[in-house]
Amino acid sequence: NSGLVYRDMSGGINEAFSDIAGEAAEYFMRGNVDWIVGADIFKSSGGLRYFDQPSRDGRSIDHASQYYSGIDVHSSGVFNRAFYLLANKSGWNVRKGFEVFAVANQLYWTPNSTFDQGGCGVVKAAQDLNYNTADVVAAFNTVGVNASCGTTPPPVGKVLEKGKPITGLSGSRGGEDFYTFTVTNSGSVVVSISGGTGDADLYVKAGSKPTTSSWDCRPYRSGNAEQCSISAVVGTTYHVMLRGYSNYSGVTLRLD
């Protein structure tokens, strides 16, 4: 319905919608999905594209910050991953996720929609369907897309306070959760995760949100025992990301 032009950001949205529709069809037929595009046509394991971490295919991008002018339509990874994150949120599933993307395509996307405009369209569709719009904004925010329709900026993350651990954290494979803290005193600080089950990865970056390709500290160890020691600069805001290498639960995050 939208007539998305098959180049630039609109081309990425166009390609993503095809992938998303395919996953929705798989969900309709089988009752579950593998989050892999084209797995059935591969004799061995793997597929053409991956929803949880699009860059696994060697061409797609995971985050809008990796987009550049002239990139091919494998920038579809941005919207594919947003769809994956949304469909895996509590109260959502593949069908509900596809519904909001489909309505956005029918009513709100235009031939040259940018990522932000496309995300805004999905939020408007969720509002039309009486679905949780905050979940949609959060999913797009994780992949670097401002889906707030130019009104309220997306959340920058929950505040992490020194000596006040946050317990019982959980997340899905490929899911991302963000926190921030601002340094008020000189000296070193330690950000750490511990406990629980599964495997969460810790990322820290000064001044902006870390991604899987841009960070100041990333221990990247098996399990949930990770820490980043930082020679903190007074007045600097640090961004912390917890990313699920696999599903995890019961994890504690602390700043010391």
From Swiss-Prot:
Top-level lineage group: Bacteria
PANTHER family: BACILLOLYSIN
GO biological process: proteolysis
Enzyme Commission no: 3.4.24.-
Cellular component GO terms, alphabetical: extracellular region
Molecular functions (GO terms): metalloendopeptidase activity
Record-linked Pfam families: Peptidase_M4_C (PF02868), PPC (PF04151)
Family label: Belongs to the peptidase M4 family.
Co-factor remark: Binds 1 zinc ion.
Entry-linked InterPro entries: Peptidase_C_arc/bac, Peptidase_M4, Peptidase_M4/M1_CTD_sf, Peptidase_M4_C_domain, Zinc_Metalloprotease_M4
Top-tier EC class: hydrolase
Gene3D superfamilies: 2.60.120.380, Neutral Protease Domain 2
Keywords in alphabetical order: Calcium, Hydrolase, Metalloprotease, Protease, Secreted, Zinc
Keyword Iron-sulfur found: no
Subcellular location: Secreted
Record-given protein name: Zinc metalloprotease
Catalytic site: 74 (proton donor)
Cofactor: Zn(2+)
Biological function: May play a role in ulcer formation. Proteolytic digestion of gastric mucus has been suggested as an important mechanism by which its pathogenicity is at least partly exerted.
Record lineage: Bacteria, Pseudomonadati, Campylobacterota, Epsilonproteobacteria, Campylobacterales
